[in-house]
Amino acid sequence: MEIAVVGKSEFVVGFRLAGIHKTYEVKNDKDLESKIRECLTDRNLGIIVLHSDDLKHISPGLQKVIDESVEPTFIAIGSKEDAGLRDKIKRAIGVDLWK
């Protein structure tokens, strides 16, 4: 399983420098949704990282798919810790890492 990062250039560049190969730069909300949908069909992806601010620009239908997705698991970073992250990790691997 691989990790993918989707977002604006300034967000994905750090991940690219850290060795993540599947980084996808998007220019606008339409590109963001398109790339997320493309990532959902890639069976090699286990985790997809997004910036939390980008989630505000995603359609409600795709937001629901992201929220309910176990594989790949979506991780939104860039803001305060979200209790949803804990639940997603627990669903994905079956273990509560915070205990």
UniProtKB/Swiss-Prot annotation:
One GO MF term on file is: proton-transporting ATP synthase activity, rotational mechanism
A Gene Ontology CC term for this entry?
plasma membrane
Q: Which InterPro entries does this UniProt record tie to the protein?
A: ATPase_V1-cplx_f_g_su (IPR008218), ATPase_V1-cplx_fsu_bac/arc (IPR022944), ATPase_V1_fsu_sf (IPR036906)
Q: How does it sit in the membrane?
A: Peripheral membrane protein
Key word Transport present: yes
Q: Which SUPFAM superfamilies match?
A: AtpF-like (SSF159468)
Which GO BP annotation is one of this protein's? proton motive force-driven plasma membrane ATP synthesis
Q: Is Transport among the key words of this record?
A: yes
Q: What top-level branch of life does the organism fall under? A: Archaea
Per its record, how is this protein called by name?
Answer: A-type ATP synthase subunit F
User: Which organism was this protein described from?
Assistant: Methanocella arvoryzae (strain DSM 22066 / NBRC 105507 / MRE50)
Name the gene behind this protein: atpF
